[in-house]
């Protein structure tokens, strides 16, 4: 069915990201053996961290897909409020990811403030989602099982945002590392 097809696609992309990550890392290690100017060595070091961040985003995407499948297969129900919170957070994470990639690809520092602001919003959303979920559980609106999946999803989204910020700020000589 469609969900399984999506899972296979996400998993295949993650395997491809792992393959590329390995090859790119090998190339960068080889390139670093040559007498590169200091500026180039620093840039190469920054790119190495970007490769790691992209690979970790792929890992989180697979984890999120696993949680989504668990939700479906175990017939876990989220409250409307919880589902709305997750969808809102997902949208913000996609925004920060797209802006981070744009900053990195175009070396455009003009969007740093926007990425910083979005990171703060996402960090607060994680806290708000977790607190809201605890309140919903206490009120009997959702189960412990849904809580575990909900928490994993929210944490996964927030970690993707952190890696996206690292990618954006990698174009600076002094980086903001999350």
Go through the PLM ranges and name each one.
Residues 1-178:
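Cytosolic, long alpha-helical scaffolding segments
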């Amino acid at each position: 069915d469609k969900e399984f097809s999506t899972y296979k696609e996400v998993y295949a992309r993650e395997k491809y990201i792992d393959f590329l990550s390995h090859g790119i890392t090998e190339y960068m290690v080889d390139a670093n053996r040559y007498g590169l100017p200091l500026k180039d060595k620093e840039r190469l070091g920054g790119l190495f961290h970007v490769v790691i961040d992209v690979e970790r985003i792929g890992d989180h995407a697979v984890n999120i897909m696993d949680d989504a499948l668990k939700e479906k297969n175990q017939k876990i129900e989220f409250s409307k409020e919880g589902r709305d919170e997750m969808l809102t957070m997902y949208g913000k994470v996609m925004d920060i990811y797209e802006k981070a990639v744009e900053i990195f690809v175009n070396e455009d520092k003009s969007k740093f403030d926007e990425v910083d602001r979005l990171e703060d919003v996402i960090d607060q959303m994680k806290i708000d989602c977790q607190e809201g979920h605890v309140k919903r559980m206490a009120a009997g609106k959702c189960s412990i099982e849904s809580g575990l999946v909900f928490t994993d999803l929210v944490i996964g989204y927030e970690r993707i945002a952190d890696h996206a910020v690292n990618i954006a700020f990698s174009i600076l000589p002094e980086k903001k590392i999350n």
